[in-house]
Amino acid sequence: MDEISLRPFDRMDFDRLISWIDSPEASVQWAGGFFRFPLDAAQLEGYRGSGEGELSTRRIFTACDGRGDRVGHIELSDIDRHSARICRVLVDPARRGNGIGSGMVRQVLRLAFDELRLHRVELLVFDFNMPAIGCYEKVGFVREGHLRDARRVGDKYWSLEQMSILEAEWRARQETTSAATGDDR
């Protein structure tokens, strides 16, 4: 897998992101009730604008591979002096299973812990989304709780897993990784 880089989410990313959200269920799985299906440019323009400015509590990113191809979307939200939440994580459906998700999450954690100096990063993920849960556990998140029947989708209820990682856990993983690879970043 190529190294993943993040850049600010922009208008040129709208069509690609819209093409990845092909059903009401996919919309809920990606964004909860934040957007209505079908996703459109007007909704994304308001969303993009909410991540701009010095006082914004969210950072919205497009993930790119080593060739610069757009391969995902990720947001760091609810940023305060101590914590934040990862949300609206999506990998191009044609590129899933190649480590892109974990690469995106690692980049956001670098921002959270190295640049913003946060103590904790959390997230919520639907309990049936085992590939995503595996991705988050791979980078060091731990499960903290189970929210039963937390979201209604059509005539069914979906449950959520709450997960988090603390700065000390992240740093310990980085030291272990650096020692194993000989990388002194």
Where are these regions (language model features)?
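Short acidic/polar active-site loop segments enriched in Thr and Asp
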Residues: 82, 119, 142
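Conserved beta-strand-loop-alpha-helix junction that forms the acyl-donor binding cleft
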Residues: 123-133, 150-154
